[in-house]
Amino acid sequence: FITLSKDKADEVSKNVKAAISKLHENQLSNGGFSYWKGGRYADNWVTSYIGHFYIEAEKKGYVLPSGSKQKWLDYQNTEARQWRYEPEYGNDFAQAYRLYTLALAGSANKGAMNRLRELKDISENAKRTLAAAYALIGQKQTAEKLFLTTAIDEDSDYYYGSVWRNKAMAMETALLIGRKTDAARWAAEIAEKLSSNDWLSTQ
């Protein structure tokens, strides 16, 4: 891990606090988050992405806006329960990420997780992300079974992705289920990519 100077650490802290405040402005009354400030509709992927950031920030000691996280949790659980598979939109990946964030927050929706797992034709990204959710709740055997049936999807444009984002998510899942050799291989590939001058998405 890199040790930051005090000035750099203060800068990081300031930026995280500013991000939390700015993202909160995008939260709707139903608890979801819109893509843009002033938006009228929640974006499923963005809602999970912001919630993921909230959880990690809170773990580091940052204070979240009052009530914001609970509203997000309520929204995520409602959407998880009401979700219906629409293969043409690839929304299985969005559901898997939603379920992962709920598990990460300590509020796993096991019923929704099991329903998604029972579908026969979900994407590689969805299976792998769902595997991470199962690993987080201690069901390592189920997680590994899902993980071992997956390959790396080349792209996921609908959800702002790339093969490198997918590899990073695969690396995390591998770590969660204890497959350190797989995780190390992807970490080396990602590190090499990050050290290059190639364009990478924000995710």
Q: What residues fall within each predicted segment?
A:
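Large, well-folded core regions of big proteins
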Residues: 1-203
